[in-house]
């Protein structure tokens, strides 16, 4: 709740013409808890994203930051959350959201990865691309009339990102097979 108060104050003093930047320490364990559904409570990642959404921000990107030496066994990645003050009025169904993800996310990921993101940072950077789609809507309505939680949205985004990378791996495997023949 305190984080929401801070983010709401930040929203109120933000200008929609300029992005709002917030540094955050993203932990891979948070991502695993969301993907696996193993978390019994909200992860820190979900809490901060909920705060951004509730305050009214749209997340434009999440950029990994290299301001410390790379440590192979480190669980965390420093990240810059780039958000913008917007007036969100549009709602979409969960099915519609999934269709938008399937249509727009691959193009966003193609652009992102062409910039040369490190393997270590791909997860968080790709997540930012998915969040830019999720946070453009005021609400995402489930079939039963309830609203999609940030937890569920993150799972859907991770699923689409995984499918994207699986597709790339399959294409590369086919290319390699053709070259060998």
Roles of regions detected by a PLM:
Residues 1-181:
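S-adenosyl-L-methionine-dependent nucleic acid methyltransferase catalytic domains
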């Amino acid at each position: 709740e305190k984080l929401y108060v801070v983010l709401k104050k930040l929203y109120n003093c933000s200008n929609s013409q300029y992005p709002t930047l917030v540094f955050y320490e993203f932990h891979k364990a948070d991502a695993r808890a969301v993907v696996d559904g193993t978390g019994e409570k909200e992860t820190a990642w979900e809490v901060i994203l909920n705060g951004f959404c509730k305050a009214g921000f749209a997340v434009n990107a999440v950029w990994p930051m290299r301001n410390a030496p790379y440590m192979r066994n480190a669980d965390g990645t420093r990240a810059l959350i780039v958000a913008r003050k917007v007036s969100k009025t549009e709602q979409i169904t969960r099915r519609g959201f999934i269709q938008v993800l399937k249509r727009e996310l691959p193009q966003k990921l193609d652009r992102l990865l062409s910039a040369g993101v490190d393997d270590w940072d791909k997860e968080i950077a790709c997540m930012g691309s998915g969040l830019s789609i999720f946070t453009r809507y005021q609400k995402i309505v489930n079939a039963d009339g309830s609203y999609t939680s940030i937890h569920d949205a993150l799972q859907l985004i991770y699923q689409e990102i995984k499918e994207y990378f699986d597709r790339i791996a399959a294409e590369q495997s086919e290319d390699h097979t053709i070259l060998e023949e």
